[in-house]
Amino acid sequence: MSVIQDLQSRDLIAQTTDIEALDALLNEQKIALYCGFDPTADSLHIGHLLPVLALRRFQQAGHTPIALVGGATGMIGDPSFKAAERSLNSAETVAGWVESIRNQLTPFLSFEGGNAAIMANNADWFGKMNCLDFLRDIGKHFSVNAMLNKESVKQRIDRDGAGISFTEFAYSLLQGYDFAELNKRYGAVLEIGGSDQWGNITAGIDLTRRLNQKQVFGLTLPLVTKSDGTKFGKTEGGAVWLNAKKTSPYQFYQFWLKVADADVYKFLKYFTFLSIEEIDAVEAKDQASGSKPEAQRILAEEMTRLIHGEEALAAAQRISESLFAEDQSSLTESDFEQLALDGLPAFEVSDGINVVEALVKTGLASSNKEARGFVNSKAVLLNGKPAEANNPNHAAERPDDACLLTDEHKRFGKYTILRRGKRNHALLVWK
């Protein structure tokens, strides 16, 4: 199966230029292809995964991937289908983000062998280009009429109070020149990107033909949508980042575990390297079992292992199991740090707090009266163990102090998992 056929079988092709000619070229020879990543934050998020993984799929098929980090274009920001002007970031900020994203992209690709991946930065050529060169050598090849007719530009112009600055309007010229430059430097003949990049990609194809007299191709990947119409890649806490310090491996694992049944088999095709036959077998087994599908667990394991590694996957599984177990002794200090980052609602507490106060502080009870009822009915657990009276000498005027949180409840001297009922948790972080 060719790489194009594999992408088609996974429904990973939104648009291409001359797919038959591209497929024939890929079957005849190994090519260089690229995808650009603008540094708009200090980390990639799961919305970047499709193009990153597509580069990897092409490399596994023997082609040479080029990961282009937009040190120059990131100074402007792509306006494609954005409702308003992007905020401009300082050169120092963008440079720091460039380095972070380069480091994140590196593990996905192999930089050894005959088709070793290439890491490029468009600041290397735009940093040496002056304004007159840009207008003479690049600008003259672009029709303003054609640029105004691009859907992404028309949407901004037609939106009341929005408009588009010349800075953002010129973005497609910069991205278009990237293709021509990478074609000249490395022989790149294919640009891939998200479906919102189609206009920028075709601009690059046209410019490369004019400047280099070469036929090149474009391929876009689909916009990832969820069956319920909500945006993929967002949680109540915001974006799901690939950086473990911004989204913990545990939360990352949980994100995939919570994928809807209607989406999970599509996402297995989109994001994993399991074969179509393996995915079809998982779906058939799930349908035949009549019980909880296995697909979400497989997806969560595959993605967490791919992004964070085997050790992080084991930690995510350990945390997931321990939160609902009586014995939480297997949790490590690092596990608690993940929970404090984004795994559980976390609350700072001080010595002397009792369980009733902790329940109200964390929102696990709406009042002291309700909290006492939970405690008396044995519905409250501390680190997996039922909360019990442990302070017989409490003051008569403070009856709730009969169940006091003490040092014995502190894991690693700092953390206590408070649980009410089966699924309601909070993390107490001791000052």
UniProtKB/Swiss-Prot annotation:
Q: Where is the signal peptide?
A: none
For this UniProt record, give its keywords in alphabetical order, as a comma-separated list.
Aminoacyl-tRNA synthetase, ATP-binding, Cytoplasm, Ligase, Nucleotide-binding, Protein biosynthesis, RNA-binding
Q: Which GO terms describe its biological process?
A: tyrosyl-tRNA aminoacylation
Enzyme class comes to ligase
Question: What Gene Ontology cellular component terms go with this record?
Answer: cytosol
Chain ranges of the S4 RNA-binding domain:
353-422
Motif 'KMSKS' region per UniProt: ranges: 231-235
Role: Catalyzes the attachment of tyrosine to tRNA(Tyr) in a two-step reaction: tyrosine is first activated by ATP to form Tyr-AMP and then transferred to the acceptor end of tRNA(Tyr).
Q: What is this protein called?
A: Tyrosine--tRNA ligase
Q: Which organism is it from?
A: Neisseria meningitidis serogroup C (strain 053442)
